[in-house]
Each structure stands twice: as C-alpha cells, then as structure tokens.
Amino acid sequence: MQIYIISYLVSICFWIWIIMKYDKFEHEPLKTILFAFFIGGLISSLTAGIFNALFSLLINFRFAPGAAGEMSIGKSMLFFAFVGFNEEFFKAAATVLLIRKMKGFNEPADALVYAMSVAFGFSVFENLEYTMRLGLASFYIRQFNAVPLHIGLAAIWGIGIARAKYLHQGRYFRTMFPYILVAGFFHFIYNFAPLLMFYPWLSLLLPTVIAFLLIRFAIRKLKRYSEDGPFSNQLICRHCNTPNSLYAKVCKNCGEKFHLEFYRQCTSCGTKVDLQVPTCTNCGAEV
C-alpha cells in the first residue's frame, strides 16, 4: 500500500509542476490548481464513467477479456468513439463550470492551465480504478501514455475555452464544441488503433507516441499563450525565440512579423489590449 501512495504522490507533484512551470508570468495559485484538479477531475470522471457504463450496456460491449458481451471490431469502434467524445466533453464542461466566473481567469493561458489540471485529475481517478484492477504495473505504464494523453487533449479544448472568453463574448459551448470533437477524435484513435496492431509492443508503443506528441503540443501552446499574455513585458519571436520590446512590429533578429491571437498593441504605450476593448487599459488611448 505504501508504494501505491508514494507513486501517486510523486506523479501528482510531477505533473502539477509541469503545468505550473510553463505558466510563466502570472502563476495561478497552487491551491486553485489543486481545487480544479480534485473537484474537476472527480466530477468529470464520475459523470463520464456513468455514461461510459450505460453506453456499454446499451450496445452489449465488454472490454475486459473473457467478460460477457461481444467485442467485435465494429462494436469496439462504436464504443471507443463514444468514450472519446464523452470523456472530453465532461472534462471540458467541468472546467468551464469551475473557472468561467473565476476572478483569476484573466489571461488565455489560464484556460489551458485549468483545463490541463482538470484533465490530470480525471486521469488520476481513472488510474485508481485501473491500478486496483490490474496492479501497479498498469499505473507505471499509464504514466507514459494515458496521463500525458489526457493532459495533452485538454490543451485542444482549452484553446476553445480561451477563444470563447477572449474572442467570442463568453459563448463557450458554441466555440468549444469543434475543439471537443477534435480532442475526442484523437482520444478515439488512441483507444482504438492498438486493437488493430498485430504485435503487442506496437499496441503499447503507438499510444505512447500519440500521448507524447499531444503533451508536447500542450506545453508549447501553454508556453506561447503565457508569453503572448498581458503579464509578459516583451514579445517573443515564434521563429527564432528572440525577446523583443512591446513596441516591436517585427523581430529584431529574423524580421518575422508579430501576430498576437488575443491582443493588439497600444501604439502609445505598448500595452497588450484585449481585442474586445476599444481603449488602452493603461493609458486610455484608442486602439
């Protein structure tokens, strides 16, 4: 039992540290991240788990080898397509429920921080079930595929949350839905593709590669949103990574033109101003 507890604590500390590390300029409070991690993870894992179970009963599908029910390719495809969308939907819904009116949600990077925290919480609760059923070996394997998968997928619909708040006047469902579909599709590929592999090592390698690419995407996106956010006092070139002043129009090193997804620059003082705001929040000039 002690090794279980230590393993989970180390995992939680590591992934929370990863999430906080790339929220570079205005760190979210640890207690708020842990709140999203625990409450959001618990809510989403319970609701998604209930609907997963109901759907498996509806189509008479059992994933466990030797269990009653059929496990044909067709039913597997249908079930994992449902699971992919279902789990991403409830993780996204729990995140919006928790943060949409939060005062600390004051830059686009925060959407990714809390989305990834909720998704990590989801993966921890999910891993408890797998570890109790299959043993500690499954826990360690899932640290290299399932956990980064959930965190990486959260960055996809986390982008939708950021765009809903900062570009679409808080129309969360309409804005997020396409991103949830994309995340659900990758989740489906992760779950279903290994069933088509002829070699056991390929069925383990493929999900790990997918998870690695997704977590790499998530970290890059979080880093970019943080660097482009209102609390950064410089512009970072996406092409050569050179820091530039807030007044820069092009990179001083490579000449790449700057483009901010959520902000425009005040020509008077260089402040990054929300696209939905007509005047600079710092000097009052029209932008």
Predicted region positions:
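Hydrophobic alpha-helical segments at protein termini of multi-pass membrane proteins
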Residues: M1-E286
